[in-house]
Design a protein with these regions (language model features):
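Conserved donor-binding/catalytic core segment of Leloir-type glycosyltransferases
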Residues: 8-10, 184, 232, 236-253, ...
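Short, structured helix-loop element that forms part of the nucleotide-activated donor/catalytic region
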Residues: 62-72, 228, 272-299
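Membrane-proximal helix-turn-helix segments that form the acceptor-binding/catalytic region
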Residues: 151-152, 161-183
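Nucleotide-activated donor-binding/catalytic signature segment of Leloir-type glycosyltransferases, i.e.
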Residues: 286-318
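Aromatic "clamp/platform" in nucleotide-sugar-dependent glycosyltransferases that forms part
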Residues: 328
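Short hydrophobic beta-strand element within catalytic cores of glycosyltransferases
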Residues: 344-352
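Conserved acidic donor-binding segment of nucleotide-sugar-dependent glycosyltransferases
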Residues: 364-365, 369-376, 384-390
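A charged, aromatic-enriched C-terminal amphipathic alpha-helix characteristic of glycosyltransferases
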Residues: 373, 390-427
Length: 459
C-alpha cells in the first residue's frame, strides 16, 4: 500500500466537456493541480489525484475529446488517472436513478483506492454525486465531501422537481448522520440555504470557498486589438454602448427578462448575448430569444454557441457598459468573478439582481451594481450603468478586480481544504470573511443540535 493519500474528484462536467458552471469549477481544479501541485503537497502532504466521470459518449452534452485528453494529461502526470464510471446510458441523465447509479460506482472506486492509499478524500461535485454521502463510513480510510453548488429550490423556481428535492434532502440527511461525510461551505448564501431548507447540521461543514485559477491565460484581459477583432467579427456595431450577457438556454438564467427590459432602451444600446443551447428541449429558447428581440426592435447580436474568447472580449470591450446577469436564481455566478478579471483595464461593470448569492459577490456601488428583482428594475439598473462616468466605471472595475484577487484564489482554498483533512493542525493558507478556519470548527460530537426548518420550496 502507498503511504500517500488519494484525492478522488467526481464530476459530470469539465472532464469530457465544459458546458456550464460546474465545468468551469472542474477546469479550475485541473489548472490548480497542474500549476500548483508542489504548493499543495507542501501544505497537505503527498497525494495522488484521480478523476471520476460518467461514461462519456458522443451523446454527452458538449462532448469534446480534447477536454478528456487534457484531463488525462494533468492527472497522469501526477501519478493518477481518469476513471470512467459505467451507468445505463439509455436512461435520462438528469434524474436521481442515474445519479444513484453513479454514486454507487464512485463509492466503489473510493473503496478500491483505500486499498492502495493511506487515506482517500472523495469529492462529489454537485447534485449528481450527492449520493456519495450515503456511502460514507463504508471504509474507515475514506472521507466524503459533497461540493454542492446549487439546489433545485434555487435553480427551478417556482416549481422545483420534487424528485430532485428528495434526492438532495436524503443526501444532506446522510451527511448529518455519517461521521466521515461532510458538506463544502462554498459561500454564505448557499450554506444558509442548506441549513434553512435542508436541515444541514453546521458541524458537517468544511470550508471550501468558490474560487478561480487566477493566473490562467483565459482569465487575462485580451488586448484591445484582440477584443476588437472578436467584437467586429460578431457584427457588433461600432460606437454604440453594449450590454453583454452570457448564459445557457435555461429559464433560471433570465435571458428572457433581459430582452424584455431592454425594450425601452432599444435606441440607446446594443445587446450582445451569448445563449448556449442545452442538450434538451430548452435549446429551443435560443430561437425564442432571437424572435422576441426582433419583435421588440432591439439592436441585438445573439450568439448560439460557447467560445470562451467571446465573453472575454465582450467584458473587456471599452463600449460594453454592463455585463448583465439577470438570473432568477444563482448561488455564485462565475461570470461575475471572471468579468472582474477580464475588465480590469476597460469594459464592463457587472449588473445583477439583489438576490441569493449576488450580494456576496457585489457590494452595490462599490464593485458593481445591484437591482431589486422587480418589474422595471433591470431597465433602471441598465440606465444607471449607462449614466456612469468614466471615472466611476474605473473605480468600480478596479474594486471588483482587487476583491476577486484577494478573495478567490482557488489554489489557496484547495491547499487549505486538503490540509484540514490530512494535516488537521495546519494553519489555513487563507480564508474569506465569514468562513472560519475549519480546524477551529466545533467537533461534531460537541456541536449543538441542528435546528431543522420546514422543507418548503423557495418562493
Amino acid at each position: 500500500m502507498s503511504t500517500t493519500n488519494a484525492l478522488l474528484y467526481c464530476a459530470v462536467n469539465g472532464i469530457a466537456n465544459n458546458t456550464n458552471g460546474i465545468g468551469r469549477q472542474t477546469k479550475t481544479f485541473l489548472a490548480t493541480l497542474a500549476r500548483h501541485n508542489h504548493r499543495l503537497r507542501a501544505h497537505a502532504g503527498a497525494f495522488t489525484p484521480y478523476l471520476a466521470v460518467p461514461e462519456p459518449t458522443p451523446a454527452t452534452w458538449g462532448y469534446n475529446e480534447e477536454d478528456l485528453l487534457y484531463a488525462r494529461r494533468v492527472v497522469e502526470a501526477l501519478g493518477g488517472k481518469v476513471i470512467i464510471l459505467p451507468y445505463d446510458t439509455r436512461r435520462p441523465f438528469w434524474q436521481p436513478d442515474a445519479w444513484r447509479e453513479l454514486s454507487v460506482e464512485a463509492a466503489r472506486v473510493a473503496g478500491h483506492l483505500a486499498g492502495r492509499h493511506a487515506k482517500v478524500l472523495a469529492i462529489g461535485v454537485d447534485t449528481p454525486f450527492a449520493g456519495l454521502a450515503h456511502h460514507a463510513g463504508a471504509h474507515p480510510a475514506v472521507e466524503v465531501l459533497l461540493a454542492l453548488f446549487s439546489t433545485a429550490r434555487i435553480t427551478e423556481r417556482p416549481r422545483p422537481d420534487p424528485d430532485r428535492i428528495a434526492w438532495e434532502e436524503e443526501a444532506i440527511a446522510a451527511a448529518n448522520l455519517r461521521p466521515r461525510a461532510w458538506v463544502a461551505d462554498i459561500g454564505d448564501f448557499l450554506t444558509r440555504h442548506l441549513q434553512d431548507h435542508y436541515g444541514l447540521d453546521p458541524a458537517s461543514l468544511r470550508s471550501w470557498p468558490s474560487g478561480l485559477h487566477l493566473t490562467s491565460s483565459d482569465l487575462t484581459p485580451p488586448t484591445k486589438t484582440e477584443a476588437e477583432r472578436i467584437v467586429r467579427a460578431l457584427g457588433i456595431p461600432a460606437g454604440r454602448p453594449v450590454v453583454a450577457a452570457v448564459g445557457r438556454t435555461d429559464h433560471t438564467k433570465g435571458l428572457d427578462v433581459l430582452i424584455e427590459e431592454l425594450a425601452p432602451m432599444r435606441d440607446d444600446v446594443h445587446l450582445a448575448m451569448v445563449a448556449v443551447p442545452t442538450d434538451d428541449e430548452r435549446a429551443a429558447l435560443l430561437d425564442h430569444y432571437r424572435h422576441r428581440s426582433a419583435e421588440l426592435g432591439l439592436s441585438a447580436t445573439i450568439v448560439g454557441r460557447y467560445d470562451r474568447d467571446i465573453p472575454r472580449a465582450l467584458a473587456a470591450w471599452p463600449d460594453t457598459i454592463a455585463m448583465a446577469v439577470p438570473s432568477r436564481g444563482e448561488t455564485l455566478a462565475n461570470i461575475v468573478f471572471e468579468t472582474a478579471l477580464w475588465a480590469q483595464h476597460a469594459g464592463a461593470v457587472v449588473l445583477a439582481p439583489n438576490i441569493d448569492g449576488f450580494p456576496e459577490q457585489i457590494t452595490d456601488g462599490r464593485n458593481g451594481l445591484l437591482y431589486d428583482p422587480a418589474p422595471g428594475a433591470l431597465t433602471a439598473g441598465l440606465r444607471r450603468a449607462l449614466a456612469l462616468t468614466s471615472d466611476e466605471r474605473l473605480r468600480l472595475r478596479t474594486a471588483a478586480h482587487r476583491r476577486v484577487v484577494a478573495e478567490r484564489n482557488a489554489a489557496e482554498h484547495l491547499a487549505t481544504l486538503l490540509a484540514t483533512f490530512w494535516q488537521p493542525r495546519t494553519t489555513p493558507v487563507a480564508r474569506l470573511h465569514g468562513h472560519p478556519a475549519t480546524d477551529a470548527r466545533t467537533p461534531r460530537s460537541q456541536a449543538p443540535t441542528s435546528t431543522h426548518h420546514p422543507l418548503e420550496a423557495t418562493p
